[in-house]
């Protein structure tokens, strides 16, 4: 085994061998889903043909959870070279709606006008409401950034995520933002904008408003609400998120985000619930719980869930 001193003296950054190791692990269907997610979370920090090709291949994986996360990663990376393959994913109605939705969101995150025709086509023709709503968001995001001339520096989230909507304009009160978020007649983009403004506020009243949105009609909005609550890691949301995870009639994309959010909050009740629903018959839910529990185990043991690039593949478990 390589010593810590030797590893520490290595040049920081992935070697070609490390990159190949991560790509192979991501695409190895014989590996546990949590290990494949470790590779995915590591590859999203890289750029170039190898990581892009592996993530695009993973976007058509038999695991819908992994496939949608791969598409999400490409959007967060804002890799324009991935656009043709992401467009092909969006058009492929044989793929799960959660994967098509994430491809549409990724196109919006990359934000190039050449994606507009397909997003408009899918908005009109895709049979899944959650995909239609995502296309609406992506189109509005591209349009708003173009018209406002928004620079990248002004759109970076304090949570380091590329969000599907820009936060609502400053000056609105938490009460006003709550009303917009909970208004079923309001456009999806404006509700998302209110959501991200409330997240950035993050005070108790803002968190309460976000939690209330878990009762919305739109599965797409509810899944983003759960995602945001995971970013905030506020224990005040635990009971509401637990209720969502337990509801087998809820859309899998919402339950999956609730599971991941509970993993971020990580109190004892949340962990027990994740262990219970790691046996859920819906793979999107059970695999989410499995990944969340694995991440918590690494955190407890003081190890990194992501692979450390200054190490060789053979010593990753010793990080």
From Swiss-Prot:
Annotated EC: 1.14.99.29
EC primary class: oxidoreductase
UniProt pathway: Protein modification; eIF5A hypusination
GO molecular function list: deoxyhypusine monooxygenase activity; metal ion binding; oxidoreductase activity
A GO BP entry: peptidyl-lysine modification to peptidyl-hypusine
Pfam families: HEAT_2 (PF13646)
Residues bound to Fe cation 2: 223-224, 256-257
UniProt entry tagged with the keyword Oxidoreductase: yes
Keywords carried by this UniProt record: Hypusine biosynthesis, Iron, Metal-binding, Monooxygenase, Oxidoreductase, Repeat
Family annotation (InterPro entries): ARM-like, ARM-type_fold, Deoxyhypusine_hydroxylase, PBS_lyase_HEAT
Function according to Swiss-Prot or TrEMBL: Catalyzes the hydroxylation of the N(6)-(4-aminobutyl)-L-lysine intermediate to form hypusine, an essential post-translational modification only found in mature eIF-5A factor.
Family classification: Belongs to the deoxyhypusine hydroxylase family.
HAMAP family (alphabetical): Deoxyhypusine_hydroxylase
Full protein name: Deoxyhypusine hydroxylase-A
Species annotation: Oryza sativa subsp. japonica (Rice)
């Amino acid at each position: 085994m390589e010593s810590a001193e030797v590893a520490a003296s290595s040049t920081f950054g992935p070697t070609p061998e490390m990159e190949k190791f991560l790509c192979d692990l991501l695409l190895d269907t014989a590996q546990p889903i949590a290990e494949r997610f470790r590779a995915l979370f590591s590859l999203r920090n890289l750029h170039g043909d190898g990581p892009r090709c592996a993530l695009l291949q993973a976007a058509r994986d038999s695991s819908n959870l992994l496939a949608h996360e791969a598409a999400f990663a490409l959007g967060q990376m804002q890799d324009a070279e991935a656009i043709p393959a992401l467009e092909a994913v969006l058009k492929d109605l044989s793929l799960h709606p959660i994967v098509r939705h994430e491809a549409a969101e990724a196109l919006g995150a990359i934000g190039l006008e050449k994606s507009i025709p397909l997003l408009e086509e899918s908005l009109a023709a895709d049979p899944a409401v959650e995909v239609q709503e995502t296309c609406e968001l992506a189109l509005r995001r591209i349009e708003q950034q173009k018209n406002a001339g928004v620079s990248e520096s002004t759109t970076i989230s304090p949570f380091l995520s590329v969000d599907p909507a820009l936060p609502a304009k400053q000056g609105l009160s938490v009460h006003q933002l709550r009303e917009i978020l909970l208004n079923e007649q309001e456009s999806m983009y404006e509700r998302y904008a209110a959501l991200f403004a409330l997240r950035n506020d993050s005070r108790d009243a803002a968190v309460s408003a976000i939690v209330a949105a878990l009762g919305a009609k739109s599965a797409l909005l509810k899944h983003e609400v759960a995602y945001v609550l995971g970013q905030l890691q506020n224990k005040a949301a635990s009971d509401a998120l637990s209720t969502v995870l337990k509801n087998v009639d809820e859309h899998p994309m919402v339950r999956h985000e609730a599971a991941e959010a509970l993993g971020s909050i990580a109190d004892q009740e949340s962990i027990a619930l994740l262990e219970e629903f790691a046996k859920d018959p819906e793979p999107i839910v059970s695999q989410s719980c499995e990944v969340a529990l694995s991440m918590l185990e690494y955190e407890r043991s003081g190890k990194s869930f992501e692979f450390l690039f200054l190490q060789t593949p053979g010593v990753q478990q010793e990080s």
